[in-house]
Amino acid sequence: MRIIGIDPGLARVGYGIIEIKNDKKILLDCGVIETGKEKKEEDRLYEIFKDLNELISHWKPNLAAVEKFFFYRSSTTISVVQARGVIMMVLASKKINISEYSPAQIKLTIAGSGKASKKEVLDAVMYNLELNKPPKPDDSADALAIALTKLNEEGFN
């Protein structure tokens, strides 16, 4: 089984891909899809669409976990929601089962507290995946935490 965890954004979409093999969690890939601020918004959304399609075609995940978006008073709210829509559309078009989790759910599942710090979540990601150094950038570590939340729900803790 392979899962892709996704931390949505317009400037940066974090992703993490984990495989379960012989009851062991194996990190296959993680990183970010970055879109340049100098580009028009529609071009940035298309870049997310294109790059996410390529990732999925390459890694062929069976499951997807996406962080739920909470509305904040911000000038980027609509852009992030649009990027999330593109992400959900790509996953649905590939017939990948999608689960969504709030930040508090992810923190609770991964670090044991819905109010866990970034460092506590990062430490839990490193522990769960037996990593010697933290995944970079932070958006990819967040995406791995999202994927691990789904795996925990599936019984792989």
From Swiss-Prot:
One Pfam annotation reads: RuvC
- Cofactor(s) it depends on: Mg(2+)
Q: What does this protein do?
A: The RuvA-RuvB-RuvC complex processes Holliday junction (HJ) DNA during genetic recombination and DNA repair. Endonuclease that resolves HJ intermediates. Cleaves cruciform DNA by making single-stranded nicks across the HJ at symmetrical positions within the homologous arms, yielding a 5'-phosphate and a 3'-hydroxyl group; requires a central core of homology in the junction. The consensus cleavage sequence is 5'-(A/T)TT(C/G)-3'. Cleavage occurs on the 3'-side of the TT dinucleotide at the point of strand exchange.
Give one GO molecular function term.
magnesium ion binding
The source organism is Prochlorococcus marinus (strain MIT 9312)
- Report the GO terms under cellular component: cytoplasm; Holliday junction resolvase complex
Chief location:
cytoplasm
- The UniProt record lists the EC number as 3.1.21.10
* InterPro entries registered for this protein in UniProt: RNaseH-like_sf (IPR012337), RNaseH_sf (IPR036397), X-over_junc_endoDNase_Mg_BS (IPR020563), X-over_junc_endoDNase_RuvC (IPR002176)
Cofactor binding remark: Binds 2 Mg(2+) ion per subunit.
Recorded hits in HAMAP family, A to Z, give: RuvC
List the active site.
7, 67, 139
Keyword match Nuclease: yes
Entry keyword set: Cytoplasm, DNA damage, DNA recombination, DNA repair, DNA-binding, Endonuclease, Hydrolase, Magnesium, Metal-binding, Nuclease
Phylogenetic lineage = Bacteria, Bacillati, Cyanobacteriota, Cyanophyceae, Synechococcales
Q: Name one GO biological process term.
A: DNA recombination
Supply the name of the protein.
Crossover junction endodeoxyribonuclease RuvC
Top EC category: hydrolase
